[in-house]
Amino acid sequence: MTVAKELRQKSSEELVKLVIKLKGELLEYRFKLAHGELDKPHLINQTRRLLATILTILTERKLNWQEEQAKYKLLTKKTNEAAVNAWKQHLEANKAKLLKSRAKREDASKK
């Protein structure tokens, strides 16, 4: 399995913890490099790439979540619009009945 596939199987919380850990390691590597103590400078690039991969996965998840929320809002809006339209059609169809019942109530209240 590739690294990205393995990372995609982890939860978002685990990935965030890994991001924090990798940022700390990257900071440590940079300090060691500045002091000439880093024996394996390729670790900086590896860590940066891994960090970028994780951040990309987290961003994808965030965008997918936002898309799902937008779809849900659109669906509920369409559903609400359909319900309102159905109610308006019902009112138009029964307008005469409603007016008669209103007139009866008004007559009853006058007596």
Swiss-Prot record:
Keywords linked to the UniProt accession: Ribonucleoprotein, Ribosomal protein
Single GO molecular function: structural constituent of ribosome
Classification via Gene3D superfamilies: 1.10.287.310
Entries under InterPro entries matching the protein: Ribosomal_protein_uL29, Ribosomal_uL29, Ribosomal_uL29_CS, Ribosomal_uL29_sf
Superkingdom as given in the UniProt entry: Bacteria
UniProt keyword Transmembrane helix present: no
Location of the region described as Unknown in the Swiss-Prot/TrEMBL record: 86-111
Ribonucleoprotein recorded as keyword: yes
SUPFAM superfamilies: Ribosomal protein L29 (L29p)
Transmembrane segments: none
Cited PROSITE patterns: RIBOSOMAL_L29
PANTHER family given in the database record: 60S RIBOSOMAL PROTEIN L35/50S RIBOSOMAL PROTEIN L29, LARGE RIBOSOMAL SUBUNIT PROTEIN UL29C
Protein name: Large ribosomal subunit protein uL29
Species per Swiss-Prot/TrEMBL record: Mycoplasma pneumoniae (strain ATCC 29342 / M129 / Subtype 1)
Gene: rpmC
